[in-house]
């Protein structure tokens, strides 16, 4: 979020006042500068993976399995992180399973909730009426549920797929959290099950970073007496092989960023190359999207430095000049800029030129124009916030959110993310869809903006910052900070409901595109869960190491 300095001079002196943020430095030094891919190991993994994939594909399409067994197999494949190898087969199976599903089957809570979650994740609108049999005549949850730990855990995870108007799932969410927390504190759960429950309470499946959650689940699954060794072996090999690829990509990005040497010219900015790549890997981790990860990371880095320029260094007059330069998007505009801004502006133009050249080779350059326009729009909104800060203006919450849905980067990140997808998926129509300001992109932006406003509020206000959504809501409604936080989290939950609903069939665009918007939303849940983990990267350091450095023991 942007803010600017009160004025360009103090007491007539030429040196402007700058409310420096003093962001924490990069954690990584030269840790990711060099990496040599062990091609022999990579090929070894790959050869075994191909054999195992065919065995698992045969499992998925084999007939004769009961519906509950089939849905559980699909769930395990998803949670192990290997379902992307079998998307077509899984979708065909789910279409048949949903068409034949009968809620009068004698399914237990675990199985019903599992069906509900898997169907909803794939766009099938199963009614929450399927849970009615677990309520008594007074509408209360049956007491027997409290003793069914796996059922409670399954229902808890299912509640994250709720849409607006599903009050039952709100009640079920609160009920299962209370029961599971009580069980964890008691003596009756095994250590393995207790660990699984504690992790779920900390991070739900639906809102988690898919690759990190896969690694967690592998550690649980290998202790499961009913595990399938073929599935487990495939999951471990797949994670480790993909980790090698991601590590090599990160090394290229890290070296590119070091060679660009932008941070030495704008030392006030956050140096977050590794964290931006982590972010991009959440958007799409699959091996075929290596170009997309590089593109998205580079654009995120440029936006991060731009944000910090408006937020923690530039004077109002400097920022107005920079905003105009970005709108022109022409190298001649550089002559009007202060020296430190010239470096940033040059990097912006050069990186987009580089991205356009790379994508043109694959016939996908048409998305670059949309990304540029989204970048220009964000900068204009940053300037609006800079003006608000200069004037000491506290907007109404509605006025604030209208601007904040731009600065939340929803449109830019979605557009830039789409640029990395296959041309037959990210079509010109897909980019035009973004221009319609779809509910899902707005909801994703609202989640990121509001959770960031809550988590970074105290630190930003301490150094001097434009009024955030929290401040605007407190002033407009005359409520305390804590009361405003409660209301903002209600809005965040409603935004998640909107995302879930937009992913139900029939969808406006391909599910392959919508899943990227969902993944961008998931980042906010992971990175900003307890504090601003982007500004304070030590919060997500273990996630980065787990994803890019620590392989799974074979």
From Swiss-Prot:
Pathway linked to the protein: Secondary metabolite biosynthesis; terpenoid biosynthesis
Annotated transmembrane regions: none
Pfam families, per the entry: Terpene_synth, Terpene_synth_C
Enzyme superclass (EC): lyase
EC number: 4.2.3.204
Binding site for Mg(2+) 3: 452, 456, 460
Cofactor or coenzyme needed: Mg(2+)
Motif interval(s): DDXXD motif: 326-330
Function, in words: Terpene synthase that catalyzes the biosynthesis of the terpene valerianol, which is a volatile compound of floral scent.
Family: Belongs to the terpene synthase family.
Domain observations: The Asp-Asp-Xaa-Xaa-Asp/Glu (DDXXD/E) motif is important for the catalytic activity, presumably through binding to Mg(2+).
Protein name: Valerianol synthase TPS1B
Name of the gene this protein is made from: TPS1B
